[in-house]
């Protein structure tokens, strides 16, 4: 029995990758359809052809991209509910959504992300690598960006840390589990615009950082908040 349990964790984690992409693709296309309908109605700015051609779609169609990401979130949550119910046979909340310590974890994660970005920004300013020119304050864009990054952070942390890392820990020690889950986290961004090997390496390191707290707490609130803060700031 122990041998079966040992193999089942890593196998479940790896086999979940294909349905993850399938569900993500299907629900993102549903989101594109909804955004297209809203664009034709003049409610938001959206054109399917230019969206696919845009080098940075989020910049040009922020509202549409936010809608698409929330449909992605719905799809991935549906997939994870199915997997937890019929494969893992555990409650969905066991992914790491315990409410204990939720507020403190969120505050700590948001604060740490802000501090890390502030330190990095200050170092680059000091070294002359970047130069502050101006600050473009657009409340609508800021709110949409925040909502967008909430969806991105929740999807990626719930799947990579809450499901993949959780199952890998059933088979391997924390170090091996962190390495494998971080590699998967990095590769999930392989098709992102302008991604390169340096970016993938940075994502791998970020995956380690985001996964460490989950290993010890089995709670997703801190890595979600840190991921959100990292992206937003």
Q: PLM features: what roles do these ranges have?
A:
Residues 1-91:
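N-terminal, membrane-interfacial amphipathic/helix-forming hydrophobic leader that caps
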Residues 9, 91, 101-104, 138-139, ...:
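Membrane-helix interface segments
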Residues 10-18, 67-70, 106-111, 142-143, ...:
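Hydrophobic alpha-helical transmembrane segments
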Residues 27-29, 199-233:
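Functionally important transmembrane alpha-helices
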Residues 34-67, 89-158, 165-170:
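Juxtamembrane helix-loop-helix connectors linking adjacent transmembrane helices
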Residues 70-78, 139-147, 155, 201-208:
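Membrane-embedded alpha-helical segments of multi-pass membrane proteins
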Residues 117-120, 173-190, 204:
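Small-polar-interrupted transmembrane alpha-helices in polytopic inner-membrane proteins
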Residues 155-180, 212-219:
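Membrane-interface helix/loop boundary segments of multi-pass membrane proteins
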């Amino acid at each position: 029995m122990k041998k079966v349990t040992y193999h089942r964790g890593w196998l479940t984690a790896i086999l979940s990758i294909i349905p993850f992409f399938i569900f993500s693709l299907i629900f993102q296309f549903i989101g594109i359809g909804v955004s297209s309908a809203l664009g034709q109605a003049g409610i938001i700015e959206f054109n399917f052809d230019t969206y696919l051609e845009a080098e940075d779609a989020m910049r040009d169609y922020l509202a549409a991209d936010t809608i698409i990401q929330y449909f992605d979130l719905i799809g991935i949550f549906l997939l994870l509910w199915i997997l937890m119910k019929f494969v893992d046979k555990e409650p969905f909340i066991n992914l790491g959504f315990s409410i204990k310590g939720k507020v403190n974890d969120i505050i700590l994660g948001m604060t740490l992300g802000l501090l890390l970005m502030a330190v990095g920004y200050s170092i680059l300013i000091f070294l002359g690598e970047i130069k502050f020119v101006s600050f473009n304050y657009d409340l609508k864009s800021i709110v949409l960006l925040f909502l967008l990054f909430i969806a991105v952070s929740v999807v990626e942390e719930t799947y990579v840390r809450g499901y993949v890392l959780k199952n890998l820990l059933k088979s391997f020690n924390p170090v091996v589990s962190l390495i494998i889950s971080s590699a998967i986290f990095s590769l999930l961004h392989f098709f992102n615009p302008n991604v390169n090997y340096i970016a993938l390496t940075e994502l791998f390191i970020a995956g380690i950082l985001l996964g460490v707290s989950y290993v010890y707490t089995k709670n997703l609130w801190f890595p979600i908040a840190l991921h959100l803060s990292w992206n937003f700031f």
